[in-house]
Structures are given as C-alpha cells and as structure tokens.
C-alpha cells in the first residue's frame, strides 16, 4: 500500500533490525490483550459471575496505567535493555502468583494484592514506536510506521483474546493468563536483546519539568480521549463474554472480539496508507464522532451473529483514532519525551479499561449484557466531546 505522503508498509522494513523488533514487540504485546479478559473468563468459568473477575481485571488495568509511565520514564533515563527485563519479570511472577492463588483458593484479597505488581508490565507499544522514531523521525515514513503499529495493536487484540478465552474455556480456567505471562517474558527479553535499534538514552532534563508533561493542555486532552476509549474497550471485552454466555455460547466471545479487532485493523491499514490533508485535530474529532455513532447499534443486538457483525462495524472506528492520537502526540511533545508521552496515552486507555471493566461488570450482574453497552455509548460521547474541544482549541490558536 502506498500512501499519499506516507510511503509503503514494505519500505518500513528496509532498515536493518526493523522486522526483528516489530516481531518481538508483537509477542511482548500479546499479554496486554490476554491477561485482563483471561481473568474475567477464568472467574466466569470457575464461579459463574463477572463482578469479581471484572474487579480484579480492573485492578490489573489500573495498576498498569499507574505503573507503566514510571517504567517508561526509567527507560528514557537508563535505556530499554536495562529496564525492560526487570519490569517484565516482576509482572510475570506476580501474574503467576495470582493464578496460583486462584488454583489453591486463597482469600480473594490476596489475588488483588498480586494484581498490583502484575501491572508493572512495560508499555511495549511505546518502546517499539520509540524505535521507529529513531529510524524514521522527521520523515513521512514515521506516520506510516505509527499506522502499522496501530494495526499490530489490533492484531494483538485479535489473537490475544482468542488465545486467552479459548484456552481458558477449552483447557483449564487459568490457561489464558498463564500463557500471557510466558509470552511477556519471552517477547520482552527478545526485544531488549536487540541493541542495534535501541534508542539512545537522552540527556537528563530537569526533574521538575519531566513531572509536568501532562500540563500540556492538548496532551492532557488526548489522554482523556484515551480514557474514554479504554472504557469502550473494557465494556466490549466483558460484555462480549457476558452476552455470549447469556446466549449459551460462551466460546463465541472470541469470534466477536476477533472481528472487533479485525474491523479496526482493516480501517487502520487503509487509513494509515492515505495521509489526508486535513488537520490531525479535525481527523480526531471525525473519528471519535464515527465511533460514537457506531457504538449505538450494540444496544439492539439480539443474537450472537448480530453482535459479531456489529462488533466488526464498531471496530472500524478504532484504529484511526489511535493513529491520529499518536501522530498528534508526536507532533506536540519534545522529542526526548516521546516515549513517556505515548505511554501516558496508553495509561489513559488502561485507566479507562479499569473503570469500564469494573462498571460494566456491576451493571451486567444487576441487569443484563445488553444494558452494559450503555456504558460504551456514554464513553463514545465523552470521547467525541473532548476531541471536539481539542479541535476548537487548535483552530483558536
């Protein structure tokens, strides 16, 4: 595919080492799409409820959102090779301890305790994007690379839930999160070993200045949009498991989630290959508006096939939002703070997933899965409202 300005996806891999870090990053990113939904599925299989699993998944996601910017800040100071293996090891061990606690029926509070350090999982997407920036910073290929990364994210959310939910349903309840912990270690160690493409450590800046990055109004607004997106993701995951269970077809959740991500990946490939002439803020407003509209039909889903189709349609709005948000972030922040800034946007998604998973779990337990989609619709409205504010601010400036 060749974009109007961005270049072809194939050209990205002309640089030595690009394919290797992209592959390692894919493996290391799979767990973020596996652990949360795997926890929900695990408890649905073991206990038949979603409140505890949703709450534990929310603790993991919220911990991830809080801890991962600290990991990225350490990476900016000490380098990926020195930081990533330790962070991944702590996360994997904590996840394994949580699963062991489930297996041996320890008090629930200890599961939540383990869920906190499990969130030390590095933001691999930010690490890979930093490597692309090192290769193609200041060139049109960088936006194409960011588009590719958005698609890779979605492929992870196709493969990850399929593996996690499928294994937890077909093998044993803890199988999905267990595989996620293993892949996290393998992928992260492989990425850290690729030293030739590792971005160099940037000179230290003033500590006070580094803590104030969210004082940039546009970046803070982008993070809020990402929080709303995270709520949508949390609802989509949990409600899919609940809806298909209500329809006596729990394994079908994997197909619905896969098609949601497929829709996003498809639109991402198309959108990323054609760099439009309109301002990024306008593109963000249009993309979030599209998402808000496409989420509404989920309230009318009456069967698993219908839900699956609606998931694909709604998913088509996701990647354009993520691509534009990352590109806009790259444009507005200092180059030596790109990894941290991208991580904050990812952290926003994590906060949203935590809130969305917990809230929709409670809503579903009190009503039904269909009602849970109201949470997603409300979040879509929040996203487009905030994106509209970003666009208006940009025009006034």
Residues covered by each model-derived region:
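Helix-loop boundary and gating motifs at the non-cytosolic
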Residues: 4-65, 213-256
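C-terminal transmembrane helical hairpin of 12-TM major facilitator-type secondary transporters
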Residues: 281-325
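Cytoplasmic helix-loop-helix junction between adjacent transmembrane helices
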Residues: 115-155
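A late C-terminal transmembrane helix in Major Facilitator Superfamily
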Residues: 336-367
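C-terminal ends and interior cores of transmembrane alpha-helices
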Residues: 89-105, 290-302
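Helix-to-loop junctions at the C-terminal end of transmembrane segments
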Residues: 66-80, 168, 266-280, 364
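A membrane-interface helix-boundary motif in multi-pass transporters
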Residues: 107, 169-182, 362-380
